[in-house]
C-alpha cells in the first residue's frame, strides 16, 4: 500500500532499476507517515561512506507529538539495504548520468519502506515528448468514447 508517490521523479527521469530500502525513523515520524503527513517531491538520495541517506524528505509532525522531543521535519534519514545492493548502486551512480531518486514510500509487513530508483535524467525534448504522448492517449480515449467536442 503506497503512502506517497514521487510523480515528479517519473517526469524528470528515466527509471532504469528499482530497489526497496528500509528507513531509520523515530517514533513520531512513523505516526506522522501513517497519517499521510509526508512529502518526497523534493527529496533525493546521496551516498556517504558506503551508506545511503534520504535527504529533503519532509515529514510534518503531528500536533499531538510529545513535548519532550524536538521534531526536525527535514532531517537526513538513513536507508537500509543489503551490502551487495549498496555496492551495485555505488558502481552504477559513479557512471556518468545516473542518480538515485526516491519513488515512493509504502508499508511492507507494517514497516515503512522507501522504493528508490536508479535513474537517468531526461532532456527537455524527452519531457515534451512524454507530455505529447500522454495528451494523445487522452485524446484517443475521447475519440473511442465518441466525445469529439471535448
From Swiss-Prot:
Top-level lineage group: Bacteria
Keyword terms, alphabetized: Cytoplasm, RNA-binding
Signal peptide: none
GO cellular component: cytosol
GO biological process: trans-translation
Task of the protein: Required for rescue of stalled ribosomes mediated by trans-translation. Binds to transfer-messenger RNA (tmRNA), required for stable association of tmRNA with ribosomes. tmRNA and SmpB together mimic tRNA shape, replacing the anticodon stem-loop with SmpB. tmRNA is encoded by the ssrA gene; the 2 termini fold to resemble tRNA(Ala) and it encodes a 'tag peptide', a short internal open reading frame. During trans-translation Ala-aminoacylated tmRNA acts like a tRNA, entering the A-site of stalled ribosomes, displacing the stalled mRNA.
Name listed for the protein in its UniProt record: SsrA-binding protein
Organism: Polynucleobacter asymbioticus (strain DSM 18221 / CIP 109841 / QLW-P1DMWA-1) (Polynucleobacter necessarius subsp. asymbioticus)
Source lineage: Bacteria, Pseudomonadati, Pseudomonadota, Betaproteobacteria, Burkholderiales
Gene that this polypeptide is encoded by: smpB
Amino acid at each position: 500500500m503506497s503512502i506517497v508517490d514521487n510523480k515528479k521523479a517519473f517526469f524528470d527521469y528515466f527509471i532504469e532499476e528499482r530497489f526497496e530500502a528500509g528507513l531509520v525513523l523515530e517514533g513520531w515520524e512513523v505516526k506522522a507517515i501513517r497519517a499521510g503527513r509526508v512529502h518526497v517531491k523534493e527529496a533525493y538520495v546521496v551516498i556517504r561512506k558506503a551508506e545511503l541517506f534520504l535527504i529533503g524528505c519532509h515529514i510534518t509532525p503531528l500536533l499531538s507529538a510529545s513535548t519532550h522531543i524536538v521534531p526536525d521535519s527535514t532531517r537526513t534519514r538513513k536507508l537500509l539495504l543489503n551490502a551487495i545492493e549498496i555496492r551495485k548502486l555505488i558502481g552504477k551512480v559513479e557512471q556518468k548520468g545516473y542518480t538515485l531518486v526516491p519513488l515512493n514510500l509504502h508499508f511492507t509487513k507494517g514497516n515503512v519502506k522507501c522504493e528508490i530508483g536508479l535513474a537517468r535524467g531526461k532532456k527537455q525534448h524527452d519531457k515534451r515528448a512524454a507530455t505529447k504522448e500522454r495528451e494523445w492517449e487522452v485524446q484517443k480515449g475521447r475519440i473511442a468514447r465518441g466525445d469529439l467536442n471535448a
